[in-house]
């Protein structure tokens, strides 16, 4: 190994320590046909990073359980926390090509461009949150590639990999689609692996350039927290029809509607349709009570309730949508959210968890986030519960006087 390569390895290690100090999450993607050198390059990088703050993630062809979740779900779940580095051996690009080549969920998508749009918005949201996404595409000449394959065949410990090579996306289809991605996206760095040490040097030089850019960008940023609501609103929530149902009618209806909800739950399961119910509203508006009545007749094996409070330390080290993406339902199941991602433009804004720039772009990000799931057939129903100030005060006083409800009172 040359002295120059050792120098580059040390520099990348130093820069990665600085990105960790600054809380910059790094995602390094390696794509390329089988036996192109992806394993050698990705492992070379992995071994020169701090093992405590780095992770290696290999994308395999989707199995039946994977298909019960949203297309990008596993990548949301495994996002690096701020300051850490993820290495992706094959990535969401290979995942997309698996779907397209094998016509996975063809009846649902019709046009697989919808998944390309999901990838674009996924990356855009992450980049806006200072995630650095570094993409490598590895090329190799046929002679060198055949040499790699022969070495793999000759080793009893790795012979199984050759069979795996034959089970991946056909080489021509993969290359054609990847070249389309590369031609449209300047973030891709193409590396020829024909000469090993030269390939390592090119990888490290590109990493150094991108890490230095990421560090400079974050060091120059200023965080401005301003959660004040300055807009005036010409409409009122109370202009809506708030007609009440009398108690007798309610008691007759609730039993019938709860039974109907149970039937809908089983119909959703049979048709593999995921359902998300989102409840937002003022304090004491009745979110918990509404959720209780919805679930009274449901089969508890098919739903979960997620009570959302202030983000934890671990959640603050991830993209703000990460904690919600992890809880989205698989096919046929129901997830109920008592407060939700809309907190980004509500309580997180007011309490200072989000800077002005972050909450201002959140509305578009939330729309794209929801679309990722509705594109796949997920039903998302959102309810906002409101009440006037007099009724709210009355309920607060009732809580103060009820020992079983005093825990609900907060500052």
Residues covered by each model-derived region:
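Glycine-rich phosphate-binding loop of ATP-dependent small-molecule kinases
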Residues: 1-411
């Amino acid at each position: 190994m040359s002295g120059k390569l050792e120098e580059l390895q040390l520099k990348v290690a130093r820069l990665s320590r600085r990105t960790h100090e600054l809380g910059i999450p790094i995602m390094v993607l390696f794509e390329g046909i089988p036996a192109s050198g992806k394993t050698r390059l990705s492992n070379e990088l992995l071994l020169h990073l701090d093992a405590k703050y780095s992770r290696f993630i290999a994308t395999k062809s989707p199995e039946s359980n994977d298909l019960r979740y949203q297309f990008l779900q596993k990548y949301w779940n495994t996002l690096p926390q701020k300051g850490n580095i993820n290495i992706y051996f094959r990535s969401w690009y290979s995942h997309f090509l698996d779907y397209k080549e094998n016509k996975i969920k063809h009846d649902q998508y019709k046009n697989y461009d919808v998944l390309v749009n999901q990838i674009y918005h996924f990356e855009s949201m992450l980049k806006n949150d200072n995630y650095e996404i570094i993409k490598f595409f590895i090329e190799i000449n046929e002679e060198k590639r055949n040499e790699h394959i022969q070495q793999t065949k000759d080793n009893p410990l790795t012979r199984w990999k050759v069979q795996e090579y034959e089970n991946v996306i056909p080489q021509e289809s993969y290359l054609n689609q990847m070249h389309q991605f590369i031609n449209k996206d300047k973030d891709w760095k193409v590396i020829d692996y024909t000469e090993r040490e030269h390939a390592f040097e090119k990888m490290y030089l590109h990493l150094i350039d991108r890490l230095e850019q990421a560090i400079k960008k974050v060091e120059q940023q200023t965080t401005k927290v301003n959660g004040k609501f300055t807009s005036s609103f010409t409409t009122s929530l109370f202009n809506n029809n708030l007609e009440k149902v009398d108690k007798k009618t309610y008691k007759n209806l609730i039993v019938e509607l709860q039974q109907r909800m149970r039937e809908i739950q089983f119909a959703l399961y049979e048709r593999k349709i995921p359902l998300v119910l989102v409840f937002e509203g003022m304090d004491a508006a009745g979110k918990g009570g509404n959720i209780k009545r919805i679930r009274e007749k449901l089969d508890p094996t098919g739903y979960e309730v997620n009570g959302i409070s202030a983000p934890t330390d671990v959640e603050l080290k991830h993209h703000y949508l990460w904690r919600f993406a992890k809880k989205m339902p698989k096919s046929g199941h129901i997830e109920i959210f008592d407060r939700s991602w809309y907190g980004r433009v509500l309580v997180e804004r007011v309490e200072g968890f989000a800077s002005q720039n972050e909450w201002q772009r959140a509305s578009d990000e939330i729309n794209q986030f929801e679309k990722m799931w509705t594109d796949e057939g997920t039903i998302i129903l959102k309810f906002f519960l409101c009440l006037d100030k007099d009724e709210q005060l009355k309920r607060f006083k009732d809580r103060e006087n009820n020992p079983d409800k005093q825990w609900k009172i907060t500052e």
